[in-house]
Amino acid sequence: MRRIVVTGMGMINSLGLNKEDSFLAIAKGECGIKHIESFDASAFPVRIAGEITDFDPTEVMNPKDVKKAGRFIQLALKATREAMKDSGILDAHNRCPEELANRMGVSSGSGIGGLGNIEANSIFCFEKGPRKVNPFFITSALVNMIGGFTSIEFGIKGPNLSSVTACAAGTHAIIEAVKTILLNGADRMLVVGAESTICPVGIGGFASIKALSTRNDEPKKASRPFDKDRNGFVMGEGAGALVLEEYESAKKREAKIYAEFAGYGESGDANHITAPAPEGEGAFRAMKMALEMAKVEVGYVNAHGTSTHYNDWYESIALKNVFGSKEKVPPVSSTKGQIGHCLGAAGALEAVISIMAMNQGILPPTINQETPDPECDLDYIPNVAREKQVDAVMSNSFGFGGTNGVVIFKKA
């Protein structure tokens, strides 16, 4: 079987515009959740989010092209530019060299894509007529345009894939890239998960199904994974990117190697459109598959940990079941308490965070652990990051519709 390694990483979220700043803030236990600034949310039951307020899309795009790309695409370009530069693949013109282009692909993921663009253009259409719809609307909203824009940006001519699996999309994008390399469809893949749904219809829609925390007066305490007083997730936005590469190709060009891909697991709940399967049965099967493939001792788990009642409870049960007992479960944390739930971007972001945690020997905390929940009784690295050397990390992502993805990385 072909070995696959990580040779480049990048991310942007409410705590940082790059991976170094982001991880430093996460390790410090900082929180990027605050009151929404991008629109007037005063009439909404939810008025908080993990919003990125200091990102200028003209840093990664020609100003005249900004209107052609939805914000989720702009965030993807920011993260992928960092990852591609980090990988050392780019030539003097910031392009994938022609001799590598045909054997490099893109695997992207997003849960909803250009929701804000859909909302805005729907209003234009109904209020001002169809002639007022932006001619760039469709191509700014389609999920697979992440791959379209990034492949054009870097001259990547291999497989161009897209995963649309709600909150598991970023993780499934990693898995699809792995499968492509394993089957010799490419030697390297640029993976990116991106999401930006902090808009009236996004907040309103998730609030209407009681999925979001209403702790509006305490934004930084609103997302509290595994805490007894949790009452919903907080929307985040961002993008995470990784360059996955066949080991021999990476060694040949003397690339820096961050980690080696060890295993993946996928499953479906066939249970409910929003609720997880009882006791996390689907999550258990995905984790079991990943662990059986990886054959490593996992030292840290970045949990899906959304700060919703059933997800956190059932994920905790699934972890105990898959590792054999409460005592055998390694340290677990959810970084969603700090940057919010970035939906389809979450899996890619959390994979980057997990790999950085492994390499730096710093396990991120689960913040806002104040009231223990007897149903969530694992070691969640409460409130303060922990210095600990681990050789392998696991990242979980579970999405609406009962779609589950798990990835494991190990030290190279």
Which ranges hold each PLM region?
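Flexible, low-complexity linker/loop segments at domain and module junctions
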Residues: 1-6, 94-101, 295-297, 328, ...
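A glycine- and small-aliphatic-rich helix-loop capping segment at beta-alpha/alpha-beta transitions
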Residues: 20-27, 116-130, 180-183, 203-216, ...
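Acyl-CoA/ACP chain-elongation machinery
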Residues: 37, 185-231, 264-278, 305-312, ...
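Active-site-proximal alpha-helical scaffold in enzymes
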Residues: 76-89, 143-154, 159-195, 233-255, ...
